[in-house]
Amino acid sequence: MQKEKTTQTRWRVKRESSMIAVIFEVWPKPDKKQKYLDLAATLRPILERIDGFISIERFESLTEPGKILSLSFFRDEAAVAAWRNVEKHRRAQASGRTEIFANYRLRVASVIRDYSMHDRNQAPVDSQARYG
């Protein structure tokens, strides 16, 4: 697996198999949002050192007040497992469950295509025929 820096996105991943998306939806308790964001910020430098980590972004829902989505990409399941088992991350998970989160949902998915307006290699054939 090689990473190649691009201007359109942080990383375009050349891969033999699909990368993994981790979609973490969290509803912090009303007075715990900042605590969650601070905790996530302390974990980020550790996450960035995980072999196979690609990127992470956080979004706040426009339609569901209080809901935050964290979208992470990893090279493979081994990278996800490495992150999941970092002891400081495990302690943060426990803290989230006991004091920060009202609820959360975690989805882990394989990325089946990865293309952009300018990098069309994995675009479906019909889309390539129509838009190049």
Q: Which residue stretches match the model-derived regions?
A:
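Short S/T/G/P-rich N-terminal loop/turn motif that feeds into the first structured element of a domain
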Residues: 1-68, 77-85, 101-132
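Conserved short loop/helix modules at catalytic or binding sites
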Residues: 92, 96
